[in-house]
UniProtKB/Swiss-Prot annotation:
Class in the EC hierarchy, top level: lyase
Taxonomic lineage of the native organism: Bacteria, Pseudomonadati, Pseudomonadota, Gammaproteobacteria, Pseudomonadales
InterPro entries documented for this protein: D_Ser_am_lyase, Ser/Thr_Dehydratase, Ser/Thr_deHydtase_PyrdxlP-BS, TrpB-like_PALP, TrpB-like_PALP_sf
Requisite cofactors: pyridoxal 5'-phosphate
Entry protein name: Probable D-serine dehydratase
Any Gene Ontology biological process: isoleucine biosynthetic process
HAMAP family per record: D_Ser_dehydrat
N6-(pyridoxal phosphate)lysine: residues bearing it: 119
EC number(s) on file: 4.3.1.18
Keywords associated with the record: Lyase, Pyridoxal phosphate
Catalysed reactions listed for this entry: D-serine = pyruvate + NH4(+)
Source organism: Pseudomonas aeruginosa (strain UCBPP-PA14)
Gene: dsdA
Length: 448
């Protein structure tokens, strides 16, 4: 029984569950998608909230440049490159034995400064927003001051009386731990069993308290939430429900618009943009997709990609039960080499907010992630962690889908030929060399 209903009844009502339960790579194109002008109201946030977040990051830029010299060249703005990957596109055509029309680009959040993953967006933003609230409330700064003042000894001593806590499979904890420690906060990261050892080691080297669990992500989050609940000096970064995290990710879209303009890429109904986003609990891809819908409206098509062993958002939105169901309820083990995506229960906030804005969801098995990892390195010389490759099959999934999605969305052959597909590479820039060599070895052995 699942939520009081026999499993057989679930399968009868939701036939795509059979593929999810069997761990077969599958896709579902959302029949409930609505015009963005209508569906954006579901989110409960708007363009003004994203603009406010962007302005906050600008205020903090002098401090970021001071604390992290690697950001000085960008003036303390944490942003990643956008690169066309034509050789990888050709390799995918051969790999999938398909034409795959359009152009293929890679958004390299994998190489964002400070923490080397997409979590450097939302995670760092939320800690900065919390620090700003505290600093303004206690008169350490004014809104028009130079925020680099927050690196001074008296401010650090003030922040040291406060703690930041978070539950994480790895990358969010890395981002929050590093920025929290840099500002002077005490920081606790509750790490699930999936977290890589090198990420724990790196956090400890920054003076962060790492609490390890033998169980999965949801337990780590719950324990972190519980620790923070009784302490007014602890701020818990709630990856399942946080508006601040969501907005930190959403800021990426306006910046991407500028990068696309600079590259001469048009985005409109005749030149659609497909963005393929790896999804764990949902905050990162949800926030980015929200920002993209604000920026490009119905000309952008956002799809979430998950491991076959951890399809929590696909499951939650497809059944309409969101965080009420976990993959484990259906006998799916939530064990994947894509550690950043090893989440069994999705964010209900993101699932409900975005359920009419996302074009679809698809799953990828671990072996395919490793093949794609090796293929990208072989064709382009770019190295990513397995999670970051989840969006790479997306161009093939869209091109070959049999569900009537392209016809329903008016995606004619001419429009697909003019399309830009963007794979959002979520992490991998800080993976130790020995670990990366092992990833590549596994991927090459599967390819050859």
């Amino acid at each position: 029984m699942i939520l009081g209903t026999p499993k057989a009844d679930w399968l009868a009502e939701f036939p795509r569950l059979a593929d999810l339960i069997a761990l077969r790579p599958s896709e579902w194109f959302n029949p409930a998608i609505a015009p963005s002008a209508e569906a954006l109201a579901d989110v409960g946030l708007g363009a003004a909230d994203v603009a406010d977040a962007s302005a906050r990051l600008q205020r903090f830029a002098p401090l970021i440049a001071r604390l992290f010299p690697e950001t000085a060249a960008s003036g303390g703005i944490i942003e990643s490159d956008l690169v066309e990957v034509a050789a990888f596109h050709d390799a995918l055509r051969q790999h999938y034995a398909a034409e795959l029309p359009g152009r293929l680009w890679l958004k390299r959040d994998s190489h964002l400064p400070i923490s080397g993953s997409i979590k450097a967006r939302g995670g760092i933003y939320e800690v900065l927003a919390h620090a700003e609230r505290l600093a303004l409330e206690h008169g350490l700064i004014g809104l028009d001051d130079d925020y680099s003042r927050l690196a001074e000894a008296d401010c650090r001593a003030f922040f040291a009386r406060h703690r930041i806590a978070v539950g994480s499979t790895g990358n969010l904890g890395l981002s929050i731990g590093i920025i929290g420690a840099a500002l002077g906060f005490q920081a606790s990261v509750h790490m699930s069993a999936d977290a890589r050892q090198w990420k724990k080691d790196k956090l400890r080297a920054h003076g962060v308290t790492v609490v390890e669990y033998a169980s999965d992500y949801s337990v780590a989050v719950e324990q972190g939430r519980r620790e923070a609940a009784g302490d007014p000096y602890t701020h818990f970064v709630d990856d399942e429900n946080s508006r601040d995290l969501f907005l930190g990710y959403a800021v990426a879209a306006e910046r991407l618009r500028g990068q696309l303009d600079a590259a001469g890429i048009r985005v409109d109904s005749e030149h659609p943009l497909f963005v393929h986003l790896p999804c764990g609990v949902g905050g990162g891809p949800g926030g980015v997709a929200f920002g993209l819908k604000l920026a490009f409206g119905d000309a952008v098509h956002c799809l979430f990609a998950e491991p076959t062993h951890s399809p929590c958002m696909f499951l939650g939105v497809y059944t309409g039960r969101h965080e009420q169901v976990s993959v484990q309820d259906f006998g799916i083990d939530n064990r994947t080499a894509a550690d950043g995506l090893a989440v069994g229960r999705p964010s209900g906030f993101v699932g409900r907010a975005m359920q009419r804005l996302l074009d679809g969801y698809y799953t990828v098995d671990d072996d395919e992630l490793f093949r794609l990892l090796a293929l990208l390195e072989r064709s382009q010389g770019i190295r990513l962690e397995p999670s970051a490759l989840a969006g790479a099959p997306g161009i093939a999934r869209v091109t070959r889908e049999p569900q009537g999605y392209r016809e329903r969305m008016g995606l004619t052959s001419a429009r697909l030929a003019n399309a830009t597909h963007l794979v959002w590479a979520t992490g991998g820039g800080m993976v130790p060399e020995t670990e990366m060599r092992a990833y590549l070895k596994r991927g090459r052995s599967l390819l050859d």
